[in-house]
Regions:
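N-terminal targeting leaders for non-cytosolic proteins
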Residues: 1-28
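Short, surface-exposed beta-strand/strand-loop-strand elements in extracellular ectodomains
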Residues: 53-70
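Solvent-exposed strand-to-loop "edge" motifs in beta-rich extracellular domains
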Residues: 46-52
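The right-handed parallel beta-helix/beta-solenoid scaffold, focusing on the short coil/turn
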Residues: 30-32
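Extended extracellular/luminal ectodomain segments enriched in beta-structured repeat modules
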Residues: 37-44
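Short, charged juxtamembrane terminal tails flanking transmembrane helices
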Residues: 177-180
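A short, hydrophobic C-terminal helix/tail in secreted or cell-surface proteins
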Residues: 157-175
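Terminal, low-complexity interaction segments
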Residues: 73-154
Length: 180
């Protein structure tokens, strides 16, 4: 990561990666908190470095409606954060093999919800109701993300459109009547 240092690093991994390996044998879950000015849907992520394999559960993403749990002085746990997850924004995904672009990619196919705040990081069992007690550790260095944004459709009010059409028709008839 760009200038990011994992403070629970001491066991031989990379201190610049997010992981789900705790210091001294315990578990912790490192995640990036991303903030956007508008609600977006995460489409994919690319990683420059990946260590570990946990099949289809190597990356966890979650859209949040609030980041109050992360504010200074907040006494929060991961269970507190789960209450802020937006519907249809939570998912666990595998990371593919290194592509021709030199990146490992993960596509978030089942996310349909959007949010202004997103967590993305190593697989987090707290957010998985079907989590097994035993899983392999994963370490990731995030390179880029892909997002999409639903553009609101511009609606035209019917009374205004009908009045404008009526005025246009009236002018056409008036011009036609003057010529005759």
């Amino acid at each position: 990561g760009y200038g990011i240092k994992n403070s629970d690093y001491s066991w031989g991994g990379d201190s610049h990666a997010v992981d789900n390996s705790g210091d001294g044998g315990g578990r912790d879950f490192d995640m990036f908190l991303l903030s956007f000015s508008e609600s977006v849907t995460l489409e994919n992520a690319a990683f420059t470095w990946v260590v570990g394999d946990n099949d289809s559960k190597e990356v966890t993403v979650a859209g949040l409606n609030s980041i109050a749990a992360f504010e200074s002085g907040a006494n929060s746990t991961w269970n507190t954060v789960t209450s802020a997850i937006v519907e249809n924004t939570l998912g666990h995904y595998g990371v593919g093999s290194k592509g021709s672009n030199g990146l490992y990619e993960s596509t978030f196919t089942k996310l349909t919800g959007s949010a202004k705040y997103w967590l993305i990081g190593a697989y987090n069992t707290i957010f998985d109701d079907n989590a097994k007690s035993n899983f392999n550790s994963v370490q990731l260095k995030l390179s880029s993300i892909g997002v999409s944004m639903t553009q609101p459709t511009a609606e035209v009010s019917e009374p205004g459109a009908l009045a404008l059409m009526g005025l246009g028709l009236g002018l056409v008839l008036y011009r036609r009547k003057r010529r005759v």
